[in-house]
Design a protein with these regions (language model features):
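Secreted/periplasmic serine-hydrolase-like ester/acetyl group-modifying domain
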Residues: 140-293
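Active-site segments of SGNH/GDSL-like serine hydrolases
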Residues: 192-193, 287-318
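Membrane/wall-proximal cationic-aromatic binding patches
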Residues: 20-90, 103-110
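N-terminal Sec-pathway targeting helices
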Residues: 1-20
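Active-site His/acidic residue clusters
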Residues: 248-266, 306-325
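Membrane-embedded segments
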Residues: 66, 70-160
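C-terminal regions of proteins
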Residues: 313-368
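Short loop/turn segments at strand-loop or loop-helix junctions that form parts
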Residues: 124-128, 304-308, 342-345
């Protein structure tokens, strides 16, 4: 026992402990946030939600866009605002890449109470998501939800019926755990991170919206006929030359989405996974309407099914659309969310010119 007490009193023990506690406290107050890796999950969710709130006084929207990377890349907020300016309407977006419904819900909880004028929410859906739901909290989702109000996150992970374990709770609670991979990357590659941070401070985003898609790369740069052909021609390890105008990042993005397209289920069967998705969607939509009422608005939610490359026609099942409509009516019997289906709106001989990869539009597709 004496040896144990002596060890506790030894400066070799408590000085490192105090340093670790001090670092954790600093991270809890957001001191590390400016140093997060560019476009990481945690950096994206913080940057997007904080930016729209910072610009709220000069740009207070009437319409709010909610969704994932499909909406983030596929909708031009400047063009939408230009088109709606004659009606006196303003559009803002809190679409965040890689988000499950729980992250979209937390983004709504953080931002919508400040947007008192929002009367319409456009929720951009991906047609396949009800069939690929998650019961556990994966690392990207943990990284994003840990950036929100902790008290809201703790209750939300149970409301959304995740299978929560102790490690999940530790990850959400301790920033030193949540940021450990990011810190490791910073230590291994400090020069690149410093350059990114310098650019961020030097080039300030003065626009009210966080992002505008500027990608000019397109699928049609690669002679792709079908999914198996796509995997073969865009495999980063195939050694084939990269077409002019493309780069290794674009090639890999196409490859990754071809792998996804090759593995995602192509049926429209309803099971526990699909039911859970729509139960979670109900929580999100109920929250939007509740906050709207608190803001003095009767918010109308409009569902939009995003377009995909026509190379993945097998995702477009009439039966899936019927499941969507049926489930949207089940979760809101008195006021079901209308569903606008734009899956095939860019089909045609030049379809490949509009897509960066199989799922995301490029700048040309966004403008169309």
């Amino acid at each position: 026992m004496k040896e144990y007490i002596a060890f506790i009193k030894d400066s070799k023990f408590w000085i490192p402990v105090l340093i670790l506690v001090g670092l954790e406290i600093g991270m809890q107050f957001g001191c590390y946030r400016p140093f997060l890796k560019k476009n990481s999950y945690a950096a994206n969710v913080s940057r997007i939600t904080n930016h729209v709130l910072e610009k709220q006084k000069e740009f207070d929207p009437d319409i709010l866009v909610v969704g994932t990377s499909v909406a983030y890349q596929g909708l031009s907020i400047p063009i939408l605002n230009q088109e709606l300016s004659t009606l006196g309407k303003k559009v803002q977006s809190i679409a965040i890449p890689g988000t499950e419904l729980i992250v979209q819900d937390l983004a709504v909880l953080k931002t919508l109470p400040h947007f008192k004028n929002v009367k319409t929410v456009i929720h951009v859906f991906e047609v396949t998501t009800p069939w690929v739901g998650q019961k556990i909290l994966n690392l990207p989702t943990l990284a994003m939800i840990s950036e929100f109000n902790r008290l809201e996150v703790y209750s939300r992970i149970y409301d959304f019926d995740y299978q929560v374990n102790v490690n999940d709770l530790i990850y959400i609670t301790l920033k030193s755990i949540a940021y450990r991979r990011d810190i490791q990357d910073l230590i291994l590659s400090p020069s690149k991170r410093i350059k990114d941070i310098g650019k961020r401070f030097k080039i300030e985003n003065l626009n009210p919206w966080d992002y505008e898609n500027s990608y000019l790369e397109r699928i049609s740069m690669y002679p792709i006929q079908d999914i198996s052909n796509c995997i073969e021609k865009t495999d980063p390890a195939n050694g084939q030359p990269i077409p002019e105008g493309s780069d290794r990042f674009h090639k890999k993005a196409i490859f990754d989405t071809c792998i996804i397209a090759n593995h995602i289920v192509t049926h429209a069967k309803e099971d526990e996974v699909t039911k859970q998705y729509f139960d979670r969607l109900k929580i999100l939509h109920d929250e939007i309407r509740r906050i709207g009422k608190e803001n003095g608005q009767n918010i109308q939610i409009i569902g939009v099914v995003a377009p995909y490359s026509q190379l993945i026609q097998k995702w477009r099942l009439t039966e899936r659309n019927e499941v969507w409509k049926r489930e949207l009516k089940r979760i809101h019997p008195s006021n079901p969310v209308p569903l606008l289906d734009y899956q095939g709106m860019l089909d045609g001989s030049d379809n490949g010119d509009y897509y960066y990869d199989l799922i995301h539009l490029n700048s040309i597709g966004m403008k169309n």
